[in-house]
From Swiss-Prot:
CC annotations in GO: cell outer membrane
Taxonomic placement: Bacteria, Pseudomonadati, Pseudomonadota, Alphaproteobacteria, Hyphomicrobiales
Mode of membrane association: Multi-pass membrane protein
Signal peptide: 1-29
Function: Component of the type IV secretion system VirB/VirD4 which could be a major virulence determinant for subversion of human endothelial cell (HEC) function. VirB2 seems to constitute the major pilus component.
InterPro entries given in the database record: TrbC/VirB2
Transmembrane segments: 57-77, 81-101
UniProt keyword terms in alphabetical order: Cell outer membrane, Membrane, Signal, Transmembrane, Transmembrane helix, Transport, Virulence
Stated name of the protein: Type IV secretion system protein virB2
Natural source organism: Bartonella quintana (strain Toulouse)
Major localisation: membrane
Gene this chain is encoded by: virB2
Transmembrane found in the keyword field: yes
Length: 104
């Protein structure tokens, strides 16, 4: 009981400190026109991280592990297919979105 309360208090303190840090920084409010550029670059970095070389290598290892688990009987075929389908969706998302948006 007291451990849960102390965790909640620590969580609230951390959230308040992070909020104070973000609100107290004047650069966020100084130039609202360039703030979207910062958001765009952060989101682009996330997409690059999710579809980059390291992510592809991790996906290869995961597919191999799922295949071995399926052949050994530890993972059923449905869960293996969901894993492979999820990897395909993650790596196919940029192409799918650009196709739907009609990129020029």
């Amino acid at each position: 009981m007291t451990e849960t309360i102390s965790r909640n208090i620590i969580f609230i303190v951390i959230v308040l400190l992070l909020t104070a840090l973000v609100v107290s920084n004047p650069s966020y409010a100084a130039n609202s026109a360039s703030s979207l550029g910062n958001v765009d670059s952060v989101l682009q970095n996330i997409v690059t991280m999710m579809t980059g070389t390291t992510a592809k290598l991790i996906a290869i290892i995961c597919v191999a592990a799922v295949g071995i688990g399926w052949m050994s009987g530890f993972i059923d075929l449905r869960k293996a297919a969901y894993c492979i389908l999820g990897i395909g969706i993650v790596f196919g998302a940029p192409t799918l979105v650009s196709t739907l948006m009609g990129s020029s």
